[in-house]
């Protein structure tokens, strides 16, 4: 079989600070008013009163969605979305394009390595540049799958289970339980600047949900980098009587010694997890060495599917789980092939968590949602990632090459 070459790469954005607000899509923080994801949630900025109530107040949604499309010389296209917005468009169109165009559609690892090395001097340890690179990598996998007529999970070696089971992240674990999810992860609302009173309030929330959900439904806390070791340790022990399954991302990404100490001091049986905002393979190797229980890379932020597969191997070698941060189809096709991913995350993007809404709505067409907390592998059997780009969205292409 003679495979085509890549003829064009294009980058659009939607939403963010230079477009319409509340566009949703790949930047799932870019939601409208009265949404749980922008309510009073603890963040590293919560210590400043003017930025405590709303995450959008400090600019969590300024980037917007990046859309990368790659076109082969036979006319077939692949695409992906992530969070990088207009700045990501510049990086793709003015820098990364030279490593993509003219390559065979199967040259994914070569392109990935060239992009990584070419951006080392300004990429740092992740962030915007890595989000952009990840989006390109995912678009390449989508194109390759569509060219050969196979879903991405089969390109990775095939499924190791018949279905993916999910826990739900959102403000209402009790509603997630009614929908058939195996657990519910809530955001914390208070942090070290609130002292013991903050701990008592978050513990009261956990206790209330435990009473509503019964003794066996999983409950977890997402702390979103907002704590220090002492506060996180006190919170974990205060929640232990309510059978908290894990405490997540208590510390900023680079505080590896802090994660090691938190794991050492955590209550017996309670897992410590992190990784959503780590952005390189090397950072995940170091994170793994802290002994945490679950690593949680975001496939749209960590280097793409190519890097996610490598992260899963690091975790597997140490007997750790890898449960990616919710990334819809981009993580579905990966985790169904990982033996150390027994469940996955579904992010509730409906404002009140009362209905199931596709995570990247409205940018993806055909994006599946769990049924009774599960997605069967047959749902993933379309070529590539199995979704199409909604070109009715307000897509802007600010740069061309």
Swiss-Prot record:
Protein known as: L-rhamnonate dehydratase
- Give the cofactor binding note: Binds 1 Mg(2+) ion per subunit.
Q: Cite the entry's keywords alphabetically.
A: Lyase, Magnesium, Metal-binding
Gene name as annotated: rhmD
- Which cysteines bridge via disulfide bonds? none
Q: Assembly and partners?
A: Homooctamer; tetramer of dimers.
Q: List the InterPro entries hit by this protein, alphabetically.
A: Enolase-like_C_sf, Enolase-like_N, Enolase_C-like, L-Rhamnon_dehydrat, Mandel_Rmase/mucon_lact_enz_CS, Mandelate_racemase_C, Mandelate_racemase_N_dom, RHMD-like
Describe the task this protein carries out.
Answer: Catalyzes the dehydration of L-rhamnonate to 2-keto-3-deoxy-L-rhamnonate (KDR).
Q: What does the record give as EC number?
A: 4.2.1.90
Taxonomic lineage of the native organism = Bacteria, Pseudomonadati, Pseudomonadota, Gammaproteobacteria, Enterobacterales
Task: Give site residues, Transition state stabilizer.
Answer: 345
Q: Which residues participate directly in catalysis?
A: 325
Please report a single Pfam family linked to this protein. Answer: MR_MLE_N
Report residues binding substrate: 29, 55, 345
Which terms under GO biological process does the entry name? amino acid catabolic process; carbohydrate catabolic process
Further details from the record: Reaction proceeds via a syn dehydration.
The similarity comment for this entry is:
Belongs to the mandelate racemase/muconate lactonizing enzyme family. RhamD subfamily.
Q: Which reaction does it catalyse?
A: L-rhamnonate = 2-dehydro-3-deoxy-L-rhamnonate + H2O
Required cofactor names = Mg(2+)
Picking any one GO molecular function of the record gives: L-rhamnonate dehydratase activity
